[in-house]
C-alpha cells in the first residue's frame, strides 16, 4: 500500500521534470572541498615539518577536524553516486539494483541519517575542545590528548550505528521521497503511527540538543576570549614595559590566543551554517509529528520535507570549504591586519596618550 503522503514511495522511475545537474554540482563541490581540506591538514595541521626538524604532534583540534572531514567525505562518496546513477538510468532507488526490492533505499536512508548525526556529534566535540582549551587549559592539557581525540570518531560511529539502525528493526520507518532519488526516515504518517513518529521526533530532539550544546560552548569560548583580551589590555596599561611599542603586544598576543581565535572563528561560522541547515529538518520532524496534516496537502508536505533533507545534505559540502578559507594564510594575514592589529594598536595608543598627559601634568 502506497503511503498517502509519499507518492513516490513505490515508484520505479525518476519523476519527470527533474535533472541531475544540481546533484552533480553538489557532489563535485563536496568532493573537491573535502579532498583539499585533507590536503591542508596533511600539509600543516597534522604536523608536516621541514627536513631534519622534529615532527610536532598533532593538536587535538586538528585531529577532530580530520575526523569530521573524513566523515563528510565518506558520506558524500557513499550517497551521491547512487543519486547520480538513478538519474542516469531513470530508475528510482528501489529499482536501481534489480531484485533488491527496497534494500538499497533502506541502506541509503540509513547512510543519510547516520552521517547527518555523526557530523553533528563531531562538530560538538570540536566545540567542547575549543571551550576547554580556553576556559580550562590545565584540564585540557592534562586530559585531552591527540590519542583521545582520535577515539571520538569511532565512539561517535558506534553510537550513530546503533541509533540510526532503529528503523531497520521496526522503530521508525524509511521511505522513498520524490523524485525517487532520496530515501530517509518518515516524518508524516497517515495513521499517526507511534513508532514512526516517535523516531522522527527522537532524531530531531537529539539534533536540537546538539545544536544548543554547540552554541553554548561557542558562546562560553567567546566569553573566555574576551577575558583574555581584557588581560592583554592589563599588560598594556600605563607603566607596563609592553606598552613601549605596538609590536610587543602583538608578538605577545599572537602565540597566546590568536590561534585559538582562528579555531573559534572557524567553529562559529561552521556552527551558524550548520544550524541554518539543520533547523529545517528539526522543524519538519516536529511539524509532522504534532500537527494534523490534511491528506490533500500530502504533496506539499513532502516537498517541504525534501527541501529540509537537501539543506541537511549541504552541511558536508560547506564545512570543508569554510575550513579551507580559514586556514588559508592570505585570509589569516588579512584578518589579523584588519581586526587584531588595530585593536592592539588602539590599546597601546590610548595608554601612551594617557601616560603623556600624566607626565605633562
From Swiss-Prot:
Entry keyword set: Cell membrane, Disulfide bond, G-protein coupled receptor, Glycoprotein, Mast cell degranulation, Membrane, Receptor, Transducer, Transmembrane, Transmembrane helix
Any one GO molecular-function label of the UniProt entry: prostaglandin D receptor activity
Cytoplasmic-side positions: 43-58, 129-150, 217-262, 332-361
Record localization: Cell membrane
Transmembrane spans: 22-42, 59-79, 108-128, 151-171, 196-216, 263-283, 311-331
Family statement drawn from the similarity comment of this UniProt entry: Belongs to the G-protein coupled receptor 1 family.
Function comment: Receptor for prostaglandin D2 (PGD2). The activity of this receptor is mainly mediated by G(s) proteins that stimulate adenylate cyclase, resulting in an elevation of intracellular cAMP. A mobilization of calcium is also observed, but without formation of inositol 1,4,5-trisphosphate. Involved in PLA2G3-dependent maturation of mast cells. PLA2G3 is secreted by immature mast cells and acts on nearby fibroblasts upstream to PTDGS to synthesize PGD2, which in turn promotes mast cell maturation and degranulation via PTGDR.
Descriptive protein name: Prostaglandin D2 receptor
Source species of the chain: Bos taurus (Bovine)
Encoding gene (name): PTGDR
Amino acid at each position: 500500500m502506497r503511503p498517502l503522503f509519499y507518492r513516490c514511495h513505490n515508484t520505479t522511475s525518476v519523476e519527470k521534470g527533474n535533472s541531475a545537474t544540481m546533484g552533480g554540482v553538489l557532489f563535485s563541490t563536496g568532493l573537491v572541498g573535502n579532498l583539499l581540506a585533507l590536503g591542508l591538514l596533511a600539509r600543516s595541521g597534522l604536523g608536516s615539518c621541514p627536513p631534519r626538524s622534529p615532527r610536532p604532534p598533532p593538536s587535538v583540534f586538528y585531529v577532530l577536524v580530520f575526523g569530521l572531514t573524513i566523515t563528510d567525505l565518506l558520506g558524500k562518496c557513499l550517497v551521491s553516486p547512487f543519486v547520480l546513477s538513478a538519474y542516469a538510468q531513470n530508475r528510482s532507488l528501489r529499482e536501481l539494483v534489480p531484485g533488491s526490492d527496497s534494500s538499497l533505499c533502506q541502506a541509503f536512508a540509513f547512510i543519510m541519517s547516520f552521517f547527518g548525526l555523526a557530523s553533528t556529534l563531531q562538530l560538538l566535540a570540536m566545540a567542547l575542545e575549543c571551550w576547554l582549551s580556553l576556559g580550562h587549559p590545565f584540564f585540557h592539557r592534562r586530559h585531552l590528548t591527540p590519542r583521545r581525540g582520535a577515539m571520538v570518531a569511532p565512539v561517535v560511529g558506534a553510537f550513530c550505528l546503533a541509533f540510526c539502525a532503529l528503523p531497520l528493526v521496526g522503530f521508525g520507518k524509511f521511505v522513498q521521497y520524490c523524485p525517487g532519488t532520496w530515501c530517509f526516515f518518515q516524518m508524516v504518517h497517515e495513521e499517526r503511527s507511534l513508532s514512526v513518529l516517535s523516531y522522527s521526533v527522537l532524531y530531531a530532539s537529539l539534533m536540537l540538543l546538539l545544536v544548543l550544546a554547540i552554541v553554548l560552548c561557542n558562546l562560553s569560548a567567546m566569553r573566555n576570549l574576551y577575558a583574555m583580551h581584557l588581560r592583554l589590555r592589563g599588560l598594556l596599561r600605563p607603566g607596563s614595559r609592553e606598552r613601549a611599542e605596538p609590536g610587543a603586544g602583538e608578538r605577545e598576543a599572537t602565540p597566546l590566543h590568536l590561534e585559538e581565535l582562528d579555531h573559534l572563528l572557524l567553529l562559529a561560522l561552521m556552527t551558524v551554517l550548520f544550524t541554518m541547515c539543520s533547523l529545517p529538518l528539526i522543524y519538519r520532524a516536529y511539524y509532522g509529528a504534532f500537527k494534523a496534516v490534511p491528506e490533500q496537502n500530502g504533496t506539499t508536505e513532502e516537498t517541504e520535507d525534501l527541501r529540509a533533507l537537501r539543506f541537511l545534505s549541504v552541511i558536508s559540502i560547506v564545512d570543508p570549504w569554510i575550513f579551507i578559507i580559514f586556514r588559508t594564510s592570505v585570509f589569516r594575514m588579512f584578518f589579523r591586519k584588519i581586526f587584531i592589529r588595530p585593536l592592539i594598536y588602539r590599546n597601546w595608543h590610548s595608554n601612551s596618550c594617557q601616560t603623556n598627559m600624566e607626565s605633562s601634568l
